[in-house]
Amino acid sequence: MHAVTESMAGRAAVLHLLPLSTVESPKVTLLRGGYPEILAHPRDSNLWFQSYLQTYLERDVRHISQIRSLAAFRRFLTLIASRTGQILNKTDLAAPLGVSVPTITEWIGILETTGQIVLVPPYFENFGKRLIKSPKVYLTDSGLGCHLLGIDTARALSRSPFSQALFEGFVASEIVKQQVNLGRRRELYFFRDQRGLEVDFIVPHGAQELVLIEATASQTVYPNAARSVLSLARSIRNHRTRCVVVHHHRCWTKTMPYLPQALER
């Protein structure tokens, strides 16, 4: 786009190509992610991700910004993977890398521009607060996240302390992919109040309805898994609500195909 010398506003459409979703391919899993090359050759995943990261850093990142140290940016990406599902705290990210907060702000912008992360802001009735409060950060592709965190088998994933956060990111990415593929505006939020009530995701559906989503990496789901979404639903007065619990079954994405159906109704 840097080579375009005249404005294309109103004359061109920009398409955002993300990794494949579970709707587009049943081979997409939490461990593999959704890059087509990985789905076609799963045994070569580590080698492919290594090559992908090298190409991404040396071509995409360097093309966007004159970063002095690509090695530092690579460590930053790994640090983001370890903080997936957490509130974005730029100061905490800057300290271990020995860089400034403005540098972290720039690097976050690069990751967002290149589609590597999904930023999920908090939900407030006041729209202005959504723009001010810090978002949660997730990697767009769970397979890349697993690679960065050294998770290369389903057994390692099930035992990893990052499994819940990675699964939340997987769900967030599926929602965003669906919205993008349907040509809709990206609208995805999380909820947390001062009393400690927290709901993983809120998706506006039209002007009058909110879909409340809880994502759990547990293989077995009990009724209390819906406690948070039901509690929030009871407190919402000016919107209709629907509650969805997405769980991590033996097959990593067994329940995921039902999520898009829930959002489309």
Across the structure, where does each feature detected by a protein language model lie?
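Active-site-adjacent loop/helix micro-motif of nuclease/hydrolase catalytic cores
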Residues: Q219-V229
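Accessory nucleic acid-recognition modules appended to NTPase machines
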Residues: R43, L47-L210
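Conserved AAA+ ATPase "SRH/arginine-finger" region at the nucleotide-binding site
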Residues: A13-V23, P42
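Arginine/glycine-rich "motif VI" loop of SF2 helicases in the C-terminal RecA-like domain
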Residues: V180-N181, S231-H239
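Switch/connector loops and helix/strand junctions flanking conserved nucleotide-binding motifs
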Residues: M1-A3, V23-E24, H147, Y222-N224, ...
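Active-site ExK catalytic segment of metal-dependent nucleases
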Residues: V211-T220
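Short regulatory helix/loop adjacent to the ATP-binding pocket of P-loop NTPases
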Residues: M1-V14
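Domain-level recognition of nuclease-like catalytic cores that cleave nucleotide substrates
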Residues: H248-R265
